[in-house]
Amino acid sequence: MAEIVDCFADRPIIVGSGLAGLIAALTMSPEPSVLVTRSALGAETSSAWAQGGMSVSLSPDDNPSLHLADTLAAGDGLCDAVAAESIILEALDAFHVLQHFGIHFDQDSNGHLALGLEAAHSRRRIVHVGGDRSGTAIVQALTACVLNDPSITVLEGLEARHILMADNVVCGLLLANPTSEIVLPSSRILLATGGIGGLYDATTNPVSNFGQGIAMAARAGAVLADMEFVQFHPTALHCHNRPLALVSEAVRGEGAVLINERGERFMADIPGAELAARNIVAQAISAEITRGGQVFLDARQALGARFSTRFPTITALCHKVGIDPVHMPIPVCPAAHYHMGGIAIDHQGRSSIPGLWVAGEAASTGLHGANRLASNSLLEAVVMGTRAARDITFHNTPHPLGTIPITPKKPDTTLIRPIVSQCLGVLRHAADMHRAIAALLPFVEGEEESSDPAIVALLIAIFAYLRTESRGAHARTDFPLKHDTTQRRHMTLEDVLEIAHSCVAQRKEKIS
C-alpha cells in the first residue's frame, strides 16, 4: 500500500528535471514546489544531451518574423501559427532568462555572440555554450540554481506511475522506486517528462524516455495531439551503442557534406542540400541505407583540424568508436530524436484535465507542426516552462484524494521496441501499421510492464494510420503525396482504442 506523504500537500508537483522542469521550478520560486525526478537531478534528460543550442534572432539581418517564417516552413503546413508566433516573440526573453541563471553563451574572437547556423534556418541564430556542450552546460547551471533554492524540494530516484483523479480533476500523484511507493496529494501537477525516443531501438534520447508522462495523461483522459510526428535526426553516429550519439546539425551548418560509400554527395541536387529540413535529409539517408548502402558525414574539407575545437563532444564520441573526424568521414544513420506530438495544451501549458499542466517535449503546443525546426525545442522548453509555472501559481483549489489504485508495474520497453522500430520508423506503410496495432493492443490492455510503452506506441500508430498523406516527419510509402489541405488531429486514448479495435476486427475479417 502506498504511503501518503502529507508534508508537501498542495504544493505544485513538477515531474522531470530537464530544461522545462528546472525552469518551471525556478520560476515558481519563492512559492514552495516539489520537483520529482527518476534519477539524479538533471541526469538522463534529453535537454542535457542537446548539442546545438537555442534559436533566437539576435543578428542585425535577422528578426522574429524571419524566425517564424522558417518555423512555419519546416512545420510543413501544420504549425499552430498563433502559438508559434507567441513563443518566438518570447525568444529574447528566454535568452535573458538563461543569462539571469548564470548561463554564458559562446562569443567569437571579437567578443560578439557566436551564432550558429542549422538546417532550414535562413539566418545564423543559434546561441550555444561550450561549442557543442549547450545542453550539458545549461542543465548544470540550472541544476545548481535549483539545489540552492530553499523553496524547491527535490525528490530523486522516484518514478511517476499514475496521476490520481477525483471527480475528473487532479488530486495527486502516485510514485514508486524499487523499495517504496508514495502518494503526493496535490491539485497541481506539471509534467515535463520528455519524449518517446526510448520506444525505438535507434534513438538519440535517454533510453528510459518512452513517453511515461504521455501514458499517464492518456490513462487519465487527457487529449493528445499530433502523435504521429516523430522526428528522426538524420545524423546519429552509426554504431552498436544504445542510445546512439548525436552528430549535431551544426556540423553540417559548418559545411560538412553527406556522402555514400562510393563517395557520392547524394544530397547535392536536393533543395537545401545537407541543410534541408530534417525529414528530407533523414528520408534521403534512409533510402541510401535501404538499398544496402552506407552513409557518412564528411567534415574533412570544411573543418579539418578545426573539428575538435568546434565540436569537442562529438570528437570524443567518435574517438570512442575508432573514428577520427579530422581525417575520416563519420558513419551516420537516422535515429528517433524528437516528438512533435504529445499532450495537447493551451498557450499557458494547461492540458484538457483540470490541474494538469505540461511543458517541454511531452507537450504539443503546435509550434513544431509536422517537423521541428532545429533548436526550437530548447526555446519552447524555456518559454512554456515559464508560462506554465506562472499560471500554476494562480491556481490552488485543493481536492481530497480519491481511490488510490494498485501501483502499476515498472514500465519495460523490451517487447515494444521491435514493433515500433519495424513498423513506425522513417518510412511507413498501412500494412506495417496494421501489424503494429494488432501487436500492441493486447499489451495496452494487459496491465503488465509493457502496458504504458504500448499505450504511447499505439497512440503513434493510430494517429499515423489515420494520416493518409506524407507530411513533414510522417512519410508513407503508400501515400507519398500531401493533401491540399490538412489539420492537426486531437484524440483521447478512448478514441484511439475504439479505432484500434475496429482495425483489428477488419484485419481478422480480411484474413478469414
Curated annotation (Swiss-Prot):
From which organism does this entry originate? Answer: Xylella fastidiosa (strain 9a5c)
Chief localization: cytoplasm
UniProtKB keywords: Cytoplasm, FAD, Flavoprotein, Nucleotide-binding, Oxidoreductase, Pyridine nucleotide biosynthesis
The protein's name is L-aspartate oxidase
Q: How is the cofactor bound?
A: Binds 1 FAD per subunit.
Q: Which family does it belong to?
A: Belongs to the FAD-dependent oxidoreductase 2 family. NadB subfamily.
Query: Active site at which residues?
Result: R278
Pathway membership, UniProt: Cofactor biosynthesis; NAD(+) biosynthesis; iminoaspartate from L-aspartate (oxidase route): step 1/1
Q: Which GO terms describe its cellular component?
A: cytoplasm
What EC number(s) does its UniProt record assign? 1.4.3.16
Q: What class of enzyme is it?
A: oxidoreductase
Pfam families (UniProt xref): FAD_binding_2, Succ_DH_flav_C
Provide the catalytic activity annotation: L-aspartate + O2 = iminosuccinate + H2O2
User: Binding of FAD: at which residues?
Assistant: 17-20, 46-53, 361, 377-378
